[in-house]
Structures are given as C-alpha cells and as structure tokens.
Amino acid sequence: MEIRVEDETDEETARAIATALSEHLGQPIEIVDDTGSKARTGEDAWDEDAAVVTDREERIRGDVQTILSGGPERGHEKIQDLGKVFVRDRLALIFDEVTYEDGSFARFTDDDKLSADGLITGHGYIDGRQVFFTANDYTVKAGSLGQMGVEKEIRLSERAVEAGAPILRLIDSTGARLNAEERDKGDTHMGRYRGGRMFYNQCIHSGQVPQIGVLYGPDIAGSAYTPVFCDFLVMVEDISGMAIASPRIVEAMTGESIDMEGLGGPQVHATQSGSCDRVVPDEEAAAEAVRDILSYLPQTYDAPNPRADTVPPVKNPKGLDAVIPDAPNEAYDVHDVIDRVVDRESWWEVKPQFARELVTGFARIDGRPVGIVANQPNHVSGAIFPDSAEKAAEFVWICDAYEIPLVYLCDTPGFMVGSKVEQDGILQRGRKFIYATSNAQVPKFCVITRKAYGAGIYAMCGPSFGADATLALPSAEISVMGPDAAVHALFGAQMAEMDGESREAFIESAKSEFQEFIDIRAQAAQMQVDELLPAGDLRDQLVARLDAFGDKRRTERDRHHGTILF
C-alpha cells in the first residue's frame, strides 16, 4: 500500500509511520512524497547488498541437490525396470506441497553418500491438511532400513502424535539393512531404541492419529509388520507384496516352492488374509486412495471430523422399499440400499474383496462422515462367517477410535453354522464383532432392512447393544431364528413320524403361526424397535438422528480394559 505524506516529513518520521501502519494493517507500506519514496516495509525494504550467499552455504545447497536426486544411476534404472515412480515424484503425486524434511543429511558422508539414508521423513499438506510422512527411497540400497533410517522413523512418528496430525507411510523397502558395516558387534536391530521401537510406537499411537500405509514393493520379514500396523493399507498391483519370509526362505525352511505374488501379493492379502484394504492398479490411483481415506478421518482422535457439502444420493431414496424383496431368502445387492441413503459419490468401501458376505466402508450422509456395516444378501445370504466377523470388528473399532458414527444395515440369517466354521473359530472370532459393537461409544444406528435372526442382530447392534436408534423398515423380521429353523427345532421329533404330505402341510401351518410372532408391526407395538418407518424416509431419519447425536458424550474410562483382543 502506498501512503503519501508532505514533502517536509523527514525520513526517520516516514519510516516510523510506515512501520506503525504495516503492523496495524498487516501488509507492506510505502511512504512517498512528491520527490519519490521515503520509506518502505516488507521485502522491498531489504538491502540487496546484504543478500550475500557464502561459499559454505553454496556447498550445502549443492549437497542438498545431490541428496534430492536419490541413489546412484543403477538404482534409478532398477525402479524403471520395476515400473516404479521415483520416491520424490511419488510424494509430488500425493502432496499439495512438502514443507520440510528431517534428516536429509543422514548417512551422507564422504565415505557413504547414502542420500537421507534411504528414508525420507517430513511434513506436508494434502488437500490443505497437515500430514507427516515417511517414504523409502528404493534407489538407495533398495529402500532398506539402516540405523539412521530407524532413528528418523521413530522421531517422525513421535512428532506427528505431538503435533496431532496423520502419518502417511509410503513403504518400498526390502527390510532391515543387515550388512556388517551397518552395525557394531552385538547389534541386531533389536535394541531398546532400535527397529522394535518403530513397531512399539505404531502400537501405542494406534487410535491417536490416523496411520495410512501404501505398499509399493515387496516387504519381507519383520518390516512387513509396518504396513499391517497401519489403520489402512493400500497395495499397488503388480509391484507390491508382503510376507513374513521371502520365497527363498520359505523354500529353504519348508520345501514349498512359490513366487512372491502367490506368497503375499496384493490379491492374496485382498481376498484371503484381509490384510489389505484396497488394491489399486497404479501409483496415481494410490495417491487418489490416500486423499479419499483422509477425507473421512480427523486429524487426531479428539479433533472434529471433516464435513463436506451435502449432495443428494445417486439414486432416489423413495425407491428403497422396492429394492428389498418380500421373500426373506431372495437375494439383492446391499449396495442398492447404500446408493439410496448416502451422499452421491461418497461411498468408499474397505476390504471390498474380502469376506464379501459383509460390506464395510465410509460414506457421507448430509456431508457427515459415517462408517457403514452391512450384511450382503447376494453372497451366502448375508450369513456372518469368521472372516466377516473379524472384518467388521476391526472396522467398528477403527470408527470408534476416530469418533466416526456407525450405521448398521442388518439383513442376516445369523452366524454361519457347521463343522468348517467351528474349526475356523466362528465363536472365538464372532465374539470380537459383538464385543466391538458393544463397546463402541460413537453414535450407532441399527437399520433392520429384512432378516435379523439369532446372534446376528447382536453383532449388528440390535436393541440390546447400545444403539442410539433401532429403525425397522416394513420388510423387517426380528427373531431368534428363521421360520424354517424354528419349526424344525420345535417340532422335529413330531414331524419325523408324519408322512411326506402331512409333514409339508404341518410345516406351512406352523410357519404361518410363527410368522405372527415376528410380525414387525406387532414388535413395533411392543417397542422392540424405536421406530417403524417407510423405507423411503430412511435417509431423512438418519440425517436427523446423526444431527441429534452429533455431540454424543462418551463414557470416560480408566486404563482398565476388557479381555477380548482384536
């Protein structure tokens, strides 16, 4: 801003006026008279002769440029052969800007010149939000973790928690650097403040700030715990993998011959182990996935959740009732329900390829982030299996950690039965789902879309499990078991003595009588649900109830905890 003064104003007075106005207005000020400028503030006032760059500063800047270029040429050729992006280009894909780094000169000596010791740590912004990061540089010793890299990781994670910001880990490492020159005699990476401390920090920081991992290469042995300790893990197709031992070690120890893709590739962890939350085709998609996940999460557990502008669902909510068949055993896709409840293009599914009989994911309702847990009737009728119980339990626990409200869409015949699921731990793992639902203190809403049989309604946050509302649609049925199972349980011995025709007639009569007891209108009259509502009103009801419970109080707990471990 230019301010004009009288010619008689001396330079000292003009400078005082300029300084006072600049401090008051918060912008540079230039004082002028008829002869020209008399005083100015801001960068324009700097003495250009004072901007001298010394030789020692030039040397540092030259070293910085060398460090920024990463490892030797053969390292860059290697990532090109593997189809990978250079780590600094990877950061540029994800971040609006990287504001600073720590430890860029780690292990950068006359003898070593290991740029940043192969691990870049720092701070930046993603969609305007502060995020701390670690990123392996595969061009430096294949991204392996050396002594200084471990130190950098430990400092980064502790500072992120102190600052109250998410941690993003871009993992592209072959694990601990084991060559002899890396350590003194007796050093095994297991010391009190060494490699193990990284995993310790990930554990004790869990639920304090979001931890997101993206896996860009094979991660083997102990370091493979880094990605699975993250709240969310994205794996890049064709180039990523993780396993507790390499294929070579596996063959040496067990005789099994297998490649990395079959041992611990993305599809293994997306469809069988459940360790991976999303598989993406390339690094650009990985960057998009990171931004998507962050858009639902707070900066820290006690910070407000990010809100977005409200947009209508992709499909008309008034058509919801027509989606749900009358017959309790007829299949439909629960995504058709979700599409009529959540804001358009806000659905982000978690573990979509794993335990597909139960759907978990984030969405927005009226711009507010929510976690959705939904039975999937078009896959094994939505029965809950050991894998899906554990999948749901983990998701519920994460939502509770970051105070994200939960919406359960219940349509399940209950927990699966049979010798196979018993051997797979249906009771042991099923209890985790019920435990997580019971202990979650965020706003919880149970929507009974159709079947709510047996212990399935317990896990899906039924009336006894602390739901802030149990809402029933006209198609809802709540029962200890389905009509078929109930009739056989009650009258099995009696029916065994009947001939075929008599038995069929008896079954139909008994089922009809049983149906009267589970009629949702009768149950609503007994207040077994909070509200029976037209399906087309569900979205509006959830909007209102989410708003009402937006400031729900959590019960303060001491450090004593339950015994059910996830």
Predicted regions and their residues:
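Short, non-transmembrane amphipathic alpha-helical segments
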Residues: 11-25
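A short amphipathic beta-strand at an alpha->beta junction
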Residues: 23-36
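Ligand-binding clefts of soluble mixed alpha/beta catalytic domains
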Residues: 36-566
